[in-house]
């Protein structure tokens, strides 16, 4: 069983890495926070931590990432976010990471074009704080 302090540290790590990669575009964090055998389940990004600096370098000047809620259980951390400038419409995502010994070892994501609240059946936004 993963201790509550480790779960909290894992959440903080994922938040820090997402900020470094997508907000500050800082590739210097890769060796420290991504495991050498980093497994990537996004079909557009290769396995391995060496793909991260390439990803950063291909972010458009107008690209913007906004973090949302973050939840964790055991060694898994999920962070809700909005990506603007990755395509013609903003994307809302849930990024899921497996963390082992203070490093990201595996990543999955679920991405969807954002539907504005005013055009959704519920009238609720896809991306908001809890």
Name each model feature, range by range:
Residues 1-130:
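C-terminal and inter-domain tail/linker signature
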């Amino acid at each position: 069983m993963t201790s509550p302090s480790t779960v909290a540290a894992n959440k903080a790590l994922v938040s820090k890495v997402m900020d470094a990669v997508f907000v500050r575009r800082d590739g210097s964090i890769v060796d420290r926070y991504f495991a050498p055998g980093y497994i990537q389940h996004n079909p557009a990004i290769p396995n391995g931590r060496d793909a991260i600096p390439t990803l950063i370098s291909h972010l458009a000047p107008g690209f913007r990432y906004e973090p949302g809620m973050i939840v964790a259980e055991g060694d898994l951390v999920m962070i809700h976010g909005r990506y603007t400038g990755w395509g013609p419409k903003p994307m809302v995502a849930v990024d899921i990471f497996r963390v082992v010994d203070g490093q990201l070892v595996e990543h999955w994501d679920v991405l969807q074009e954002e539907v504005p609240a005013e055009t959704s059946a519920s009238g609720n936004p896809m991306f908001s704080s809890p």
